[in-house]
């Protein structure tokens, strides 16, 4: 899908096309998995694969409807990626779900005897490779998994793929901001055309002068 073809989608997407492009949503890696091929439309001259923005938009709609059906207190969002910590916290604060940031300890979702055991009916991960422990345990327990998947992501035990750049600060911020908006609209927490009470910029991870990510 060329840029000219993408421009024809204006008015059909949840947000203006420019917002998706500015956030780098479609920028993948130089590797691809056969499972992600249906979501890839081309490759740049530098070898980076590009994801289909229309399919990303479609999957966000599906994910929002799926999330809205679940009790938010039993919905866990996992992010081992530092750049995902802030957007996940913001998303969970608005939606009412549980953030799980950093490394997931073995048995978190499978062993009720552990002090850190967490019961979940639905899980979302920012990267199925980085968050593999959580995804594997979700598969064992029959917990549906929504995953942000890049061009080279593994999809074992993933029930719903959202194709996106899952490494960039702006991309992660936009995905969680948009998903929060759609969930709240579907649940009736904000009007059908309402906006979130916080701006997109609040979802983006920040790098301090010390190098710390917050």
From Swiss-Prot:
InterPro entries with a match to the protein in the record: Ribosomal_uS2, Ribosomal_uS2_arc, Ribosomal_uS2_euk/arc, Ribosomal_uS2_flav_dom_sf
Gene3D superfamilies given in the database record: Glucose-6-phosphate isomerase like protein, domain 1 (3.40.50.10490)
Database matches in Pfam families: Ribosomal_S2
Keyword vocabulary terms for this entry: Ribonucleoprotein, Ribosomal protein
GO biological process, one term: translation
Entry GO terms, CC: small ribosomal subunit
GO molecular function terms noted in the UniProt entry: structural constituent of ribosome
Family: Belongs to the universal ribosomal protein uS2 family.
Name of the protein this chain belongs to: Small ribosomal subunit protein uS2
């Amino acid at each position: 899908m060329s840029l000219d073809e993408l421009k024809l989608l204006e008015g059909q997407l949840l947000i203006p096309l420019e917002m998706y492009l500015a956030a780098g949503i479609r920028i993948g890696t130089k590797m691809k998995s056969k499972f992600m091929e249906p979501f890839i439309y081309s490759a740049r001259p530098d070898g980076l694969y590009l994801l289909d923005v229309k399919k990303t938009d479609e999957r966000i709609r599906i994910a929002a409807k799926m999330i809205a059906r679940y009790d938010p207190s039993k919905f866990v969002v996992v992010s081992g990626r530092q750049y995902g910590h802030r957007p996940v916290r913001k998303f969970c604060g608005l939606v009412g779900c549980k953030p799980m940031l950093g490394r997931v300890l073995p048995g978190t979702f499978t062993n009720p005897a552990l002090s850190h055991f967490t019961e979940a009916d639905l899980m979302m991960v920012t990267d199925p490779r980085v968050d593999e422990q959580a995804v594997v345990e979700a598969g064992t327990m029959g917990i549906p998994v929504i995953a942000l998947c890049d061009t080279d992501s593994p999809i074992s035990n993933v029930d719903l793929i959202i194709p996106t750049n899952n490494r960039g600060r702006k991309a992660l911020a936009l995905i969680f901001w948009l998903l929060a908006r759609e969930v709240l609209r579907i649940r009736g927490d904000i009007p059908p055309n309402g906006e979130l009470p916080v701006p997109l910029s609040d979802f983006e991870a920040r790098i301090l002068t010390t190098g710390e990510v917050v």
